[in-house]
Design a protein with these regions (language model features):
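Membrane-embedded alpha-helical bundles that form conduits across membranes
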Residues: 1-447
Length: 447
């Protein structure tokens, strides 16, 4: 008997699934919120999934398939209305990609004339009822030094918009160079490429000279495993993922190499991991909650040791450490060490000042950064430099650093200076997660 093609005729089970989900949403919308029921619902700006899905891996370690996770992309175009059908098609394609790669997440894309306007749309419309994100996670802008000032302003504006929308904000800097993008590029093609192609068809311009499908050769150097266990001898360490030798398809050629794909980063568990938390300001407890969740099962840092650092005056070091230890015990957050940072406001070392001067030197004398602003913000700059000194001295061996993020103050601090601060707090470190809550309490003393 011949077997025909699969045809979905529908079923009563599918109809009941939709009705049950709808009823559950109604019940949730009428449920009174309480700090004990708080869940981190994350909107992560991954952009193209095949390029930045390591952000999705990291977010999954927090949500653990039990909280809302939305992967989002903003397609910047001069004519965003013309891309509505393209966005719909790509949402379906990327949703299938998420299911194939076993991510419990949704994908959402919008087309907009600018990044900040697109993020504003996402912050307003993502989710439904009370099942909507309350944290915005985005990657660090690594190319800020070579970017236009308008692009830096767009990035900082994005952070400010999230605070205005009463979101918590997380900025993640991987600081890893031994990862690459080479897999699944055809399955989830960048939406920006399609936006460019759509614009070119409308303006009758010439075809794009380069695209993902036109790549001729892709070569990657051999790298070492940065997540290697200390007990394993380095000469026997081998990458757990490799690309097959002399693989070619269409116009692509992948040479023999050993490296880590971004799809695997933050999916493999780290042995003997340590999370360092720099709780510098009270933001409702989000800076403590996220590393606590990263300690739990189903995380790449499962079972990690937690070291907490806070600030104090020299005369109050012991008292502050004792108070913090008591507070963590009340919150039922396990920790291995509590340390108070002394003299956070004193003048930094000359090496740190020289490093800061090197960062600002290309912009001095321009309208983007004035001497008067540097003088007015000197105390905050020194504070960030002193924090960096302490992080370099105490957390260079950590698996992850979680630190309270400074808030951008509009009309007081320029976007460029704020970007320099973020860079100084994260450059040359292990992976760093900058966190700032929305002052909503996410931890409670009571059971």
């Amino acid at each position: 008997m011949l077997k025909g093609n699969y045809v979905n005729w529908g079923s009563s089970g599918q109809a009941h699934a939709l009705r049950n989900a709808l009823n559950a949403m109604y019940r949730l919308d009428n449920t009174e919120e309480h700090v004990k029921n708080y869940r981190p619902q994350i909107l992560v700006l991954t952009g193209n999934l095949s390029e930045r899905n390591h952000l999705l891996n990291f977010a999954t370690s927090i949500t653990k398939d039990s909280c809302l996770l939305i992967s989002a992309e903003v397609i910047v175009s001069d004519n965003p209305d013309s891309l509505i059908s393209t966005v719909t098609d790509e949402e379906a394609k990327c949703t299938a990609w998420l299911a194939k790669n076993k991510y419990r997440a949704f994908f959402h894309a919008v087309s907009s004339a600018s990044l900040s306007d697109g993020v504003r749309q996402l912050l307003q419309i993502s989710g439904l009822g009370k099942l909507k994100p309350n944290i915005l996670l985005l990657g660090f802008k690594n190319n800020w030094k070579t970017s236009k000032l308008d692009d830096i302003a767009e990035y900082v504006t994005t952070i400010g918009l999230a605070f205005d929308a009463d979101f918590g904000v997380c900025v993640f800097r991987c600081n890893s160079e031994n990862v690459t993008d080479s897999e699944n590029v055809d399955e989830c093609k960048p939406l920006m490429d399609q936006a460019n192609q759509e614009e070119q068809r409308q303006t009758n311009n010439t075809e794009l000279k380069t695209s993902i499908n036109d790549c001729q050769t892709f070569t990657i150097e051999m790298v070492e495993d940065e997540f290697k266990s200390e007990n394993e001898p380095s000469n026997n360490a081998k990458p757990k993922k490799t690309i097959c030798q002399n693989f070619s398809r269409k116009n692509k050629t992948f040479k023999k190499c050993n490296f880590y794909l971004k799809k695997d980063l933050f999916r493999q568990k780290v042995k003997h991991a340590t999370i360092d938390v720099y709780w510098l300001f009270d933001d409702g407890g989000l800076t403590l909650l996220l590393p606590y969740l990263l300690q739990l099962p189903k995380s790449y840092l499962e079972g990690a040791k937690l070291r907490v650092f806070t600030i104090a005056n020299n005369k109050e070091l012991e008292h502050q450490e004792t108070s913090m230890a008591t507070l963590l015990s009340k919150f039922r957050v396990g920790y291995t060490e509590v340390t108070a940072i002394p003299n956070i406001t004193k003048k930094p070392d000359q090496k740190s000042l020289d490093e800061f001067q090197e960062s600002i030197s290309p912009f001095l004398g321009t309208a983007a950064l004035s001497e008067s602003e540097l003088l007015a913000e000197r105390s905050r700059t020194w504070r960030h430099l002193r924090t960096r000194e302490f992080m370099l001295a105490n957390s260079s061996d950590a698996s992850l650093i979680v630190i309270t993020m400074p808030i951008p103050r509009r009309r007081v601090c320029s976007d460029l200076l704020y970007m320099i601060w973020l860079d100084l707090l994260t450059r040359g470190m292990p992976p760093v997660l900058l966190v700032r809550g929305n002052q909503r309490s996410v931890l409670t003393f009571y059971t």
